[in-house]
Design a protein with these regions (language model features):
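Conserved alpha-helix/loop element of class I SAM-dependent methyltransferases that forms part
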Residues: 32-51, 66
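A short SAM/SAH-binding and catalytic strip from SAM-dependent methyltransferases
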Residues: 119-133, 156
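A short acidic, Gly/Pro-enriched loop at the edge of an enzyme's catalytic core
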Residues: 109-120
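Conserved catalytic/acceptor-binding region of the Class I
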Residues: 134-135, 141, 145, 149-220
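Conserved Class I S-adenosyl-L-methionine
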Residues: 2-4, 14, 19, 26, ...
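Conserved hydrophobic residues forming the short capping helix/wall of the S-adenosyl-L-methionine
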Residues: 71, 94, 171, 201, ...
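Class I SAM-dependent methyltransferase SAM/SAH-binding core
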Residues: 52-111, 135
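A generic alpha-to-beta junction signature in SAM-dependent methyltransferases
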Residues: 45-47, 71, 144
Length: 286
């Protein structure tokens, strides 16, 4: 495992503490929610090419394993994530289903990959959390062969994704200590500006860059909604320390705020994303 330093420590601490365990616990719900995006990533790597594929920010391995199943014996998939709780789940899933994928617990920004080891890189919401995105994208470029394909999905703006901010907006008046999103830093909407993404990729050794909007219709069971917003996101960080009365008031208020998204047994929302494609340029940046 890489040992992160400086600002990288913050992400390592975050994803190896209760946040990481919460995401591991919610794995079935999250995999179901984001299943509509899975095909977009898998289509980037066809069975006719096979080869070695890297899944960045792989979490509990859902996309990595799906791709490994599609490629079969002619390919090999490697997932990398900074979170030990998530990688532990991913490895257990691979072993349980007998899928030949492997997983690395490390920070993809600083991990020393074998040069030109991969034929493609994919990521589902895994590239927005780097401390230094340019450094991370250059490191990924060094890990792939020339002309290798990069495809990732990232969130567009918070304004275009009201479902994702409903909980914190509803809870903010009741929780003065609720962590605010940091503008310009690592986080869910760090790649919301397509011009910034294009600039980062072009400066990190990637070419043939294409960025297009994708709106995915996502769902989760209504029965999982309260667990979803109390375990994940800003509320998941502060509610464990709240007294019972405050917690009940927050849960009631936030649950009501989600009513526009609830349709009987399902919660439905649109994930407004960017689908980003690029090819590794002929020369690794120095």
């Amino acid at each position: 495992m890489d040992v992160p330093h400086g600002a990288d420590d913050e992400q390592a601490a975050r994803w190896n503490a209760p946040v990481g365990h919460a995401w591991a616990e919610m794995q079935p719900v999250l995999d179901g929610m984001f299943q509509p995006l899975e095909g977009l990533l898998l289509d980037a790597v066809t069975t006719t090419h096979g080869g070695h594929v890297l899944d960045v920010g792989c979490g509990t391995g859902g996309t990595t394993l799906a791709l490994a199943r599609r490629l079969g014996p002619q390919g090999h998939c490697v997932g990398i994530d900074i979170s030990e709780p998530l990688i532990t789940v991913a490895r257990a899933r691979a072993e349980q289903e007998g899928t030949p994928a492997s997983f690395i617990q490390a920070d993809a920004e600083s991990h020393v990959f074998e040069p030109a080891a991969f034929d493609a890189v994919i990521s589902r919401f895994g590239v927005m959390f780097f401390h230094d995105s340019a450094r991370a994208l250059a490191n990924l470029r060094s890990a792939v062969r020339d002309e290798a394909r990069l495809r990732f999905v990232v969130w567009r703006s918070a304004e275009e994704n009201p479902f994702m901010t409903t909980a914190e907006r509803a809870a903010a008046p009741l929780l003065p200590d609720l962590p605010a999103r940091r503008q310009g830093g690592p986080g869910q909407f760090a790649f919301a500006d397509p011009d910034t993404v294009h600039h980062l990729l072009a400066g990190s050794g990637w070419a043939q860059i294409h960025i297009r909007p994708v709106d995915a219709d996502c769902t989760l069971p209504t029965s999982e909604l309260v667990r979803y917003f109390t375990r994940l996101g800003p509320l998941g960080q502060v509610l464990p320390d709240a007294d019972e009365q405050s917690r009940a008031r927050v849960v009631k208020t936030v649950r009501a705020a989600f009513d526009p998204f609830v349709q009987g047994p399902e919660v439905r929302f649109t994930a407004a994303c960017w689908l980003v494609d690029a090819r590794a340029g002929a020369h690794t940046p120095t």
